[in-house]
Amino acid sequence: MIDYILLIISTALINNFVLVKFLGLCPFMGVSKKIETAIGMGLATMFVLTVASLCAYLVERYLLTPLHANFLRTLIFILVIAVVVQFTEMVIHKTSPTLYRLLGIFLPLITTNCAVLGVALLNINLAHNLTQSVIYGFSASLGFSLVLVLFAALRERLTAADIPLPFRGASIALITAGLMSLAFMGFSGLVRV
């Protein structure tokens, strides 16, 4: 049990996919202008990452490895992720049309979010079992969502700040992301990985 807690802490905080591994930067910068959109994107990504980790493990274990088709891993994982994202998009469209409109193009872009594919591939490379794969996917998405919501809150505060003209827009967003990355480096001594 303690191993799973350490896996969650190390994946969500210490080895954060956005701030440490630089995966998932497109939705991180694109959806973080409003906190409501960031929360919605975080929840959608959380669902997709967790389910995609489970599906990728099952496909690897029961399809690719027995057939010795490991060379198709990336292609098959992209297909699995696309199916999970399409399912998520249909569910969000039915349950919350407002959130569906707010997320716009970013929801289908979860398919090409490199963090989702990165988590699926890292699960295989780290030789996680089924439980560890699901926990790793969930904690990676938890870290992604946490960083996304915190960054959206900072960007909303920046709109009210008096920022010099050359730093407005993407410049101050990247500076803020860098400072967030430095803040998350403080977690590096928390757990030895």
UniProtKB/Swiss-Prot annotation:
This is Ion-translocating oxidoreductase complex subunit A. The keyword Nucleus does not apply. The keyword Cell inner membrane applies. Belongs to the NqrDE/RnfAE family. The gene is rnfA. It comes from the Bacteria. Keywords: Cell inner membrane, Cell membrane, Electron transport, Membrane, Translocase, Transmembrane, Transmembrane helix, Transport. It is found in: Cell inner membrane.
